[in-house]
Amino acid sequence: MSVKIRLKRMGAKKRPYYRVVVMNSTSPRDGRAIEELGYYHPVEKQNQIKIKEDRMKDWISKGAILSDTVKMLLNKNNLNAKSQEV
């Protein structure tokens, strides 16, 4: 079982927000998550992204793979994304 850290779409039509979650890589996009690590609001102007960095580091150390979108969001928001290479 491969585990990924990726986005789960929530919200209303034309007003999306996303939860940053840990999921089995074969689960559907909006399927059941193992753990929720934070959120991302692309429509909001302030406080767009919040992530529990300690939990993310823990999952990465256990072998979870970051999706390309999550990597891009971490780099764009200057969050501690250098632990991706573990």
From Swiss-Prot:
It comes from Borreliella burgdorferi (strain ATCC 35210 / DSM 4680 / CIP 102532 / B31) (Borrelia burgdorferi). GO terms for molecular function: structural constituent of ribosome. Keywords: Ribonucleoprotein, Ribosomal protein. Belongs to the bacterial ribosomal protein bS16 family. The gene is rpsP. The lineage of its organism: Bacteria, Pseudomonadati, Spirochaetota, Spirochaetia, Spirochaetales. Pfam families: Ribosomal_S16. It comes from the Bacteria. One of its GO terms (biological process) is translation. This is Small ribosomal subunit protein bS16. InterPro entries: Ribosomal_bS16, Ribosomal_bS16_CS, Ribosomal_bS16_dom_sf. One of its GO terms (cellular component) is cytoplasm.
